[in-house]
Amino acid sequence: MDGSAHPNPGKGGFAVVELDDDNRVKFCHQEQFEYTTNNEMELRACLYALIYYGHRYHLFVPIVYCDSVYAINTLTNWKNNWKRNGWIKSDKKIPENLTIIQKYDIIEEKGYQIELRKIEGHKGILGNELADALATGRMTEQEVMRKYG
């Protein structure tokens, strides 16, 4: 999965890509936005992955690879502390992208789970490269499925 905005803030998008054991694309999804931030798109990608994979693979916790330290920290390290403190950060400010974070939290409370794992972006990792191409609009879902599906 990946999210992007260019310029930041500016036009952006996010994408989620699922590969099979042979590195063929089983599933991909992209959404584009006229005005957004990079961090918002990374969080939206995580939210989409939680909904999609949490519903589809409810008998185990799927691993989702993410190149955003911000998204991983927000959803795995900071979110629960902010929630305990009334959705206020330690600096007494409201977290950016709070509505997305709260939606993620609500869906997790319903039992949906994913494990977010950090990967390096732009290092030739096929799933991440395809998600980046989709998030930035360089490729469409149809092009990815035709070429890599």
Feature-to-residue mapping (PLM):
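Short, conserved alpha-helix that lines the donor NDP-sugar binding/gating region
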Residues: 42, 46
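RNase H catalytic domain
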Residues: 4-8, 47-130
